[in-house]
Curated annotation (Swiss-Prot):
This is Dehydrocurvularin biosynthesis regulator. One of its GO terms (biological process) is DNA-templated transcription. Residues 28-59 bind DNA. The gene is Dhc4. The keyword Transcription applies. GO terms for molecular function: DNA binding; DNA-binding transcription factor activity, RNA polymerase II-specific; zinc ion binding.
Amino acid sequence: MSSPRAAPSHDTFPNAKRRKVRKGTHSCWECKRRKMKCIFDPRITSTSCNGCRQRGSPCISQEFVQDDSHVAHGANDSASLDASTPIATPSDDARRADHDILTPVSVDSEPYRYLPSSKSSDKRFTTRSSNDASTCPMKHEKLSKYLHEALPSREDTERICKASRHSSILAHELLTVPYDTLYRNGLKTPDSLLAIPEPHVHPVLIAKHMLQLATFLQHLHPDLDKEIKVLSESPRAIMQRLVDIAIHHITTNNELLGSVESLECVMIESLYQANIGNLRKSWVAGRRAMSIAQLMGLHRSDSLSQYKVLDPKTEYNPQLMWLRIVTLDRHLCLLLGLPQGCTDRSMASETCLSNDTQMGRLERLHCVLMSRILERNEYSTNAQHAVVTREIDLELQKAARGLTSKWWLAPKLNTASADLQVHFWDTRRLLAQIFHYNLLIQLHLPYMLRVSSDESKHDYSRMTCVNASREVLSRYITLRNLNRIAYSCRTVDFIALMAAMALLLAHMNCHRAGAVNPLAHQYLSDRAMIEQVQENMHEINKLNSDALSAQSADLLKKLLAIEMEAGDTRVSVSEASNGVVQQDGTTREEDGVVSVQVPYFGIIRIGKDTPTKNQASVTATMHGTAPLHLDRFPTSINTNSDPVHVHSQADFPSSTQLSSSSHPNTPSPALSLNNIPFHATCMAALPDSSVVFTRQQHQKQQQEHQEFGGDLATVSDTSFPSSLHATWQDNFPELAAGSEDWAFQGVDMAFFESIMRSDTNLGQ
């Protein structure tokens, strides 16, 4: 039971008239009137009792004279709903200070204006007007003061603004303001960051400034921007400190929900995490933004929304904010292999498309098509998969034709350009092109390595995936030749890595004895482009000490080391059943083999595989030349200098067992993808499939071994030591770990999972 605490003291109301109260009186006027116990939560620094906080009413101690207006406050609230503009006086504002914050329990009592949704992309929305809505309520004075004191000094802020190079535009405006308005009025420059909020303003507005400053710092580097070398603390330290404080006190504080600015703060947090490489944290923040937006009703395009605006100068469009939230969510879901948060597709209605710009229309169509790809990946049956894929492909073609052919030329980025606005929009166009080609890769990747009795059946998907990968990589080189700051345009690094891997695997798959290689003439130019991408990633790591760039460059370097040869040698992509993972995440492998540890997935083994005589015999009999094959096996962990092997007891034959009599006891695991246990094995010799997944019902093993999750590997071995099982789990990063602990963030897992999609999910 919480001990009662005195209601707001006389310090809170320095000019108020005090009255004498009986000894032991602690309750406020509102609790006394309601005959309720007045309790303060000791865990919360607040001048309001629990009851007043829940009701959203002023909490005034009985030692102060009660104003009759407070008693009738509830009735006045109801009347204000019907008023076109509520009447507010300075005394009213002071007494109603606690109402400036919407909490889930005070929705009914807050005097909102209910607003019809906009049918024009340029319309501004305003809610209940308040002369001092941006002023901090009394219960948040300490928080506002604390946040203000955490801001960098004005001298540091001025240096940060002067350090702007090609990042001289505040991109966070894209989250709230439509393109046509930004084209017409221009984007804000860093000088707007010099408008530092006063210590008495609402804490959400101070946090918004902190997050804007942090996201701007992401695009700067001390070695490239000399002005920030003399800051009172390192730019990265300032950036991290500002974000940590804003997240801890504002974006995760349910008491501060309800305003457009608070939603914008959560959106900026999600964008910040994505740029820093923390895709999983970005996804979590994005889902929080989606939930808040739904509570506000922003998803209800043809209905009513409810929210408030703290600062009348805030520019925003609620439907655009909803579009940005949903787009980022679907983009991250594709990268991470996660289900989408909502299936809303109203953003591509005829009305929305007609009111937007060319690039805005493309992005709206991309948002809807991402939803369809995610839906296909999640629910499509064997018969539907190919049909849905073809439909989405045609829609992407239609979306591309909505812009002129000249628009699709890769823009030439030049920091020397005097017009920074033009440079910004050229970069934005380049990114939109990359995202378009990434959708093509995501759409056709499951078919890229498949073969069929009809050899040309999947050629379209393979060639589309190859060409889209080239388009992504060429634009990535253009971007990173100019912008080598790791925290700028971060998601493009993940997309480029997937494109490079897809292109390399496509070339590997084409090097088969006796088969015509349709990519032979492009191999050297493609290889040179991937080498340039690898060099760019290496340089970014040298400049930024960036884990993602370092590991991506290392992986591509190893893949490039695999020689592409014809003859009787084929290239295999499988997962090593006995791979040994050291503490640094590398594996011990023979020459010519690349092994990648994928957390929660296994060890991917990529290398040349020379078939045995028996293998060649089976291959010739069943299907001709074997293409790439993929297996997935669990990871074994080495926590000390001695290797520890995981051996899985096989109760069904692996591809090696089928093709070679010299290894009759090759271990084989059971896997669980989408909660369906099956064995993934290379059976390239079988007709109509390069990857065959043999389903096995291992009920006994399922009872004895818990799955790590819906998409995680399950080891099928009753002798698997529980201590080693625990060690294996302990060595995985946390599910929402940052990029320093989990560089690839699970993007590699989603990539290989897409390639290894089972026949039950793919059309034949």
